[in-house]
Amino acid sequence: DPHSVILWTRRPYAEGARQLLTVEVAEDQAFKKVVAHARAPVLASADWTSRVLVGGLKPAHTYWYRFTDADGNGSRIGRTITAPLPDDPRAVNFAFVSCQDVNEGKLNGYRRMIFEDERAAAAEQLGFVLHLGDFVYEVVWYPEDRPQGYYARRLRDVVRYPHGEKIRDF
């Protein structure tokens, strides 16, 4: 539906089985033009996650959103875009990512994707990023953790470049 988006968040609570969040959707990042409010239940039985359908939006339009709890604590501000109408001739650009392992040291792909998207012409910017996996693994094993002799790499900067370098066939 090009007039709606599904927004998702996770907000753990120490007590209770159900809490309510408020989600606001705005046409500007400063939330001066809020166009929608919705209540979003978070449930212990769903790992304190919530999904909320927000309707009444413009097709192919960028919006900003945030979740707040009853105490006024807020999430980071997110950005979303509604789908275009079926007869919209403009291209819709997708990217996909999958599970990542910090131990392998290849998380710079996310940074590169964002960097290139922010600098692209509007018609070339990403409309959607689909995450195919469900984890970012962040376990780093240290020698004292694995006395049997298996040691993964510790994360460190080997070299820092002031500017990116293009590597042929990389």
Task: Label each region the model flagged.
Residues 1-170:
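Divalent metal-dependent phosphoesterase catalytic cores across multiple superfamilies
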